[in-house]
């Protein structure tokens, strides 16, 4: 509840559960993306069916095991539905699923959204991030180079917020590119289990 502009009145917001939320996650950051969806769904009184990437089912197993341990009689509020494309399609077509939240490529969204909308379902799509940096003449170029590099190469570039392009003011373009090339040359790319790899 919150105050109203009208004297002696208050405004009240009520969240109405919508039912079952289907959550389709990609291979990268599978637990984080599920957690965001789960928190939003559950705080509004909804259950969730999680269809993880076939490349990250171990993460789903671990989360489900923890959930079952702490959920008591509410274990069924989180279900895990493993599989690939066929299972994702089935989840999208199921009229019992009120909302499908999917994270992945733009192509995946183009294929799944029509399946949900054909039954007048709801979608929440996080697809194909395409991020840019705008670098102004007043920028601290040493700091900017580090930020741009981390945004483009951090976590091997496998995240939706990965930097794909930079717009650099012409007055600083040459200096920025020299610093960027020099910084990239210091990156140690290698086996991810090797602590010296970046």
PLM segments and residue spans:
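Rossmann-like NAD(P) dinucleotide-binding subdomain of oxidoreductase/dehydrogenase enzymes
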Residues: 2-143
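ALDH superfamily catalytic-core signature
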Residues: 69-70, 107-198
């Amino acid at each position: 509840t919150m105050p109203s502009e009208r004297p002696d009145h208050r405004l009240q917001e009520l969240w109405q559960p919508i039912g079952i939320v289907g959550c389709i996650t990609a291979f990268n950051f599978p637990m984080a993306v599920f957690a965001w969806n789960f928190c939003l769904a559950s705080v509004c009184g909804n259950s969730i069916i999680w269809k993880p990437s076939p490349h990250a089912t171990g993460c789903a197993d671990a989360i489900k095991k923890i959930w079952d341990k702490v959920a008591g009689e509410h274990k069924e509020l989180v279900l895990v539905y493993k599989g690939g494309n066929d299972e994702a399609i089935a989840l999208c077509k199921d009229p019992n699923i009120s909302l499908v939240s999917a994270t992945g490529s733009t192509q995946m969204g183009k294929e799944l959204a029509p399946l949900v909308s054909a039954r007048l379902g709801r979608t929440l799509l996080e697809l194909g991030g395409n991020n840019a940096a705008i670098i102004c003449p007043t920028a601290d170029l040493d700091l900017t180079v580090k930020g741009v590099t981390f945004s483009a190469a951090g976590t091997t570039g496998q995240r939706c917020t990965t930097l794909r392009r930079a717009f650099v003011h012409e007055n600083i373009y040459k200096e920025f590119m020299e610093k960027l090339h020099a910084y990239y040359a210091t990156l140690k790319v290698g086996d991810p289990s090797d602590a010296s790899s970046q």
